[in-house]
UniProtKB/Swiss-Prot annotation:
Signal peptide: none annotated. Disulfide bonds: none annotated. Keywords: FAD, Flavoprotein, Oxidoreductase, Tricarboxylic acid cycle. This is Probable malate:quinone oxidoreductase. It comes from Shigella boydii serotype 18 (strain CDC 3083-94 / BS512). Residues 521-548 are annotated as: Disordered. Residues 530-541 have a biased composition (Low complexity).
């Protein structure tokens, strides 16, 4: 019966798309150089790059909702972290010999420096206005307890001192010092508990929804840019000249139109996979998606909010995905401070918060069903974790909060459903299928269509991700003197690494901090810490990571 239902649903969707395409033929076809599908931060960032690189190119942006930045880019639908690996312990895994690997942390931090430079440049151009409306200084802290975790944090701190990107980080195992940094976390805690923390003053809280709205508002000032809201893509067809005809339904009046585009970017968040499949390019057959949602506890009580100014990340429990690490965060949303704690994983078959319960089923094909099954069979610990999260009670969530805020009161907190994160599942020759953390740009060989899949680190690295897309799709243009000069004006460090160059790191941090109104003091000498005891780690099955 389920197979029959699925078949009928697929037929209905297919017939509807054919009908839409037929109706659209009757109307005049719109032409555009660049079609941006999705009104989130990725499309907004790519459009902003292209506006500077090729100001004469026409652009059309499509958004199925009634406003932009309503899904994962919305400030309430994500944690608002400027991910730079200052506190996120999952970016510094422990090796078998007990040493700490910092390569991933360095890469994440380098990427965020590109985002800071991109935003600073847009502020100088007047594209982004009032930096405090979208980015604020909020110190980033790691906080752990227990002897093994304290030893891990010692080793992590020592390892990160090798990088110029992490200079200025502080370390302490002293209760009084940590209480000064994060009083809410320490008050009411057992004074005999062994704890440790790191703190970096230059951490940030970012409202990605506000950035998105401001970027798009600036794009709209040009006559060769068009934003179409309540517009849903129903079909994509490659033409003989390698342009694309995209059939778009107006969700308000039921009409349809065809848009002919030279280049199509699918930046539709969770919906990107289905649209990539609709394009029919062979590269899409390697991918599947699995949706995971997230919930946060939220407090707007001034007694709580005014007592906490930090993002405090802990360490994931044994057997849990590294990215599932709980954190208690200062956020600045809609002009006021709030505190969030989470995330707690949730499950829905929707690929978007405003999506359809059919999303997961309709994206499952004969080419990706086996990789999905392999991932499920190979990652039973992950499945068990997700089930345990879905089964959490109100009391369970509150007890988790008290590990980070011992004196928390239930009446100060409410539960908030954040956005959906579609995890990448990719075909693998050896394993059949693997779960991939991170984002991935998928494009055709001709460079006429590209999609962004994945969820983490996501919005905080929109600027470097879109740089990667430009290099992948417009390689010849990127190598031209004109584009090189423009890209280096937008991102001064473009084409080189900051890590290892103390002077360059300080110069870029000083520049972006001044323009964005962020706190920055030149780093002082590193804190002296007990020498970490590097212990060989027991061999354990690696738990696949997911983004919440």
């Amino acid at each position: 019966m389920k197979k029959v239902t699925a078949m009928l649903f697929s037929m209905a969707v297919g017939l509807n798309a054919v009908s839409m395409a037929a109706k659209a033929k009757a109307s005049e076809e719109q032409e555009t150089d660049v079609l941006l599908i999705g009104g989130g931060i990725m499309s907004a960032t790519l459009g902003t790059y292209l506006r500077e690189l090729e100001p004469e190119w026409s652009m059309t942006m499509l958004e199925r909702l009634e406003g932009v930045a309503q899904e994962s880019s919305n400030g309430w639908n994500n944690a608002g972290t400027g991910h730079s690996a200052l506190m996120e312990l999952n970016y510094t895994p422990q090796n078998a010999d007990g040493s700490i690997s910092i390569e991933k942390a360095v890469a994440i931090n380098e990427a965020f420096q590109i985002s800071r430079q991109f935003w600073a440049h847009q502020v100088e151009r007047g594209v982004l206005r009032t930096p405090r409306s979208f980015i604020n200084t909020v110190p980033h802290m790691s906080f752990v307890w227990g002897e093994d975790n304290v030893n891990f944090l010692r080793a992590r701190y020592a390892a990160l001192q090798q990088s110029s990107l992490f200079r200025g980080m502080r370390y302490s195992e002293d209760h009084a010092q940590i209480k000064e940094w994060a009083p809410l976390v320490m008050e009411g805690r057992d004074p005999q508990q062994k704890v440790a923390a790191t703190r970096t003053e230059i951490g940030t809280d970012v409202n990605y929804g506000e950035i998105t709205r401001q970027l798009i508002a600036s794009l709209q000032k040009k006559s060769n840019f068009s934003l179409q809201l309540s517009s849903e893509v129903r079909a994509l067809k490659r033409n003989d000249d390698n342009t694309w005809t995209v059939t778009v339904a107006d969700l308000k009046n039921g009409t349809a139109q065809n848009i002919r585009a030279k280049f199509v970017f699918i930046g539709a968040g969770g919906a990107a996979l289905k649209l990539l499949q609709e394009s029919g390019i062979p590269e899409a057959k390697d991918y599947a998606g699995f949706p995971v949602g997230g919930q946060f506890l939220v407090s707007e009580n001034p007694d709580v909010v005014n007592h906490h100014l930090a993002k405090v990340y802990g360490k994931a429990s044994v057997g849990a995905p590294p990215m599932s690490v709980p954190h208690i965060d200062t956020r600045v949303l809609d002009g006021k401070r709030v505190v969030l704690f989470g995330p707690f994983a949730t499950f829905s078959t929707k690929f978007l918060k405003n999506g359809s319960l059919w999303d997961l089923m309709s994206s499952t094909t004969t080419s990706n069903v086996m990789p999905m099954m392999h991932v499920g069979l190979d990652n039973f610990d992950l499945v068990k974790y997700l089930v345990s999260q879905v089964m959490l009670s109100e009391e369970d969530r509150f007890e988790a909060l008290k590990e980070y805020y011992p004196q928390a009161k239930k009446e100060d907190w409410r539960l908030w459903q954040a956005g959906q994160r579609v995890q990448i599942i990719k075909r693998d020759a050896d394993k059949g299928g693997v779960l991939r953390l991170g984002t991935e740009v998928v494009s055709d060989q001709q460079g006429t269509i590209a999609a962004l899949l994945g969820a983490s680190p996501g919005a905080s690295t929109a600027a470097p991700i879109m740089l990667d897309l430009l290099e992948k799709v417009f390689g010849d243009r990127v190598s031209s003197p004109q584009w090189q000069a423009t890209l280096k004006a937008i991102v001064p460090s473009y084409g080189r690494k900051l890590n290892g160059d103390v002077a360059a790191t300080e110069r870029e941090l000083q520049y972006t901090s001044e323009v964005l109104g962020l706190k920055y003091d030149k780093p002082q000498a590193a804190d002296s810490t007990p020498k970490p005891q590097l212990k060989p780690q027991p061999v354990q099955k690696e738990v696949a990571d997911i983004a919440l």
